[in-house]
Regions:
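Long, low-complexity, polar and repeat-rich extracellular regions
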Residues: 1-194
Length: 194
């Protein structure tokens, strides 16, 4: 299990610089000036801690489900990923985009290397052609936990005959400890698109 494309560990990471815990590693940026063609066991595109991935085109992001961990075509933890959606995630492009795997906005305020919670987490994916499709669910831990100080979120553009098969892929997620705002504790399926 691994990430096909990963950008992260920016900012201050004391574990990585014990001699200088105040060292700032800056941002990690990946800019793909065309389409992607990813086939991965694990995550397709992943960012954390001031990581940024921008894909000008579309392409394919195919992940294969595993039963021991979550399976994401795109996942972000205090960083941003924009595919076929412009440099700011607000301008959907015209490229074919096929993604198989969940989309995750992870509020990692736990475990080893928790995020600093000083930057937003944003994902924008533009499925704007009849040949474009998303198979997977959208998990937004910021919305689920009711902790979203930086207005983190996902913009899923679904236009011009593109399709979305909204189902969870891979390992089942446990029922949340807190009631979800919608009262739907069976499964979290993102219901909004543009």
């Amino acid at each position: 299990y691994m990430s096909a494309v990963y950008a992260g560990y920016g900012g201050k990471v004391p574990r990585l610089s014990k001699d200088n815990p105040d060292r700032d590693f800056g941002d990690t940026n990946i800019h793909v000036k065309g389409n992607v063609d990813i086939d991965a066991i694990g995550s397709g595109l992943q960012v954390n801690q001031r990581g940024h991935i921008l894909v000008d085109g579309g392409g394919k992001i195919i992940t294969h489900p595993v039963e021991t961990s979550d399976t994401y075509s795109v996942v972000a933890e205090e960083g941003d990923v924009y595919v076929n959606a412009g440099a700011d995630g607000k301008h959907p492009g015209t490229h074919d985009l096929v993604a198989v795997g969940n989309v995750g906005l992870i509020n990692k305020d736990y475990g080893r290397d928790p995020n600093h919670n000083v930057e937003p987490t944003n994902i924008a994916l533009a499925f704007t052609t009849p040949n474009s499709s998303l198979t997977g669910a959208v998990l937004n831990e910021y919305a689920e936990s009711n902790k979203n100080p930086h207005n983190s979120g996902a913009d899923i553009y679904l236009q011009n005959g593109a399709t979305w098969n909204n189902e969870w892929i891979g390992m089942e997620r446990p029922t949340p400890k807190k009631e979800r705002p919608s009262g739907d504790n069976e499964a979290y399926l993102y219901k909004g698109s543009k």
